[in-house]
């Protein structure tokens, strides 16, 4: 039993800022000690500080709950000092509900019925639950299902669970919430993490011993490899969902599937057969197949394991301009140069076609994870969000021509590249809302693509016509890094979704650069160029 708290004795606050009330602080620490199983230490803290964890009446109330003294606990509840009648009713309801269930367990059916009629129902709380309790009288399976040789143990557990539920209803000044100290510490860590400009590592690496602050070494800024297998400008690239592969497409009319290994990125398959430059690629949801789209030509579907072309999608007199998968992998979508969007079965059967001003000749195409929305650039400065089930169309209207866009992994945000050298972040979840803008990269003539990336997609990366890769902090919009190395315009970037420390960039200089952390490059940068067109680099050209 703790000694009574001495009024005016000692400091009433803790910490250098004078904002932590000592009594609350000690009580929260004691609560944490008890929760961690340090019962003697918690009791000793109460005794030495003279600050009890709970008042004597609350301790009596808790003991009555754990011992199943339901009628006494209701009386004590009214002596705790609660003023909110709604809280009193809610707490009383849970206590009497447990009393009712205990009586049924003991086969005291008439007593249970009396409790339901004269004590629970008059509270006027949770009528649907009252009806459910009433059904137990006509459903003998309930009683038989709860009886067991371990009935006393089960009751003790249910009473502990009840106490936890009551704790959520009672004011924190009466009964300190479970895990309150842990919640405050986690809250502080999350705030430090969110304020860290370069945070790009798992939270388990955060420490309580010092304020959290990552350095630039958490950002992929070192060119670990230069991939040189394409014979012309590399226009597009994309990591697979599992991060094990990278696909690239080029003006040389080919696509390449690269395999991401611990030792580096290596060429797996070179995909040939298109008669025009390839504008984009799209991974199937399971990463077993890949779509490649020729510029106003056809779409080809490939087996990733074998490199075999499984199907060619084409429409007489029309050319494809974009491609994408349904979330279940059963259909594909394509934009056509007559500005329509079509949906196909894998065998090539056309299922549906949305005609009219749905897409442009050079266009991105995305399908949200629930399969409901198709997103495309429908006019020079407009993006269409088409709900194909509800037949509802929404539009993002920009004041500049749109060159490309990228959908976030959680399908809530859209990154839009504009002709005026600006990237805009839109929230598309409910009402369309402009969230942030990113500036600094160069674009005057070409299609430059950007992407989300890093841990929790906390960063934005973009190509640029000045041969640099640009990196911004997503939340603040601050430019945090520019990566030199390419000798031509950087057309596209892709961040590995399974590795926040790996970034790829595609350039007019016919190369792909794999960027990683400085401390990872040591084992790779000294290697000689491979015969398959892969060159290892320490960042130079």
Predicted region positions:
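Per-blade loop-tip surfaces of WD-repeat and WD-like beta-propellers in eukaryotic adaptors/scaffolds
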Residues: 212-222, 257-276, 296-320, 327-328, ...
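Conserved strand-to-loop turn within each blade of WD40 beta-propeller repeats
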Residues: 249-252, 293-296, 335-338, 377-380, ...
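Loop/turn segments within WD40 beta-propeller blades
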Residues: 237-243, 282-287, 324-329, 366-371, ...
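Eukaryotic adaptor/scaffold assembly regions
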Residues: 1-221, 527, 532, 538
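Beta-strand-rich domains and repeat architectures in extracellular enzymes and scaffolds
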Residues: 228-246, 250-251
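Canonical WD40 repeat/beta-propeller blade segments in eukaryotic WD-repeat proteins
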Residues: 232-238, 276-282, 318-324, 359-367, ...
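A surface-exposed beta-alpha-beta supersecondary segment
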Residues: 216-217, 436-459
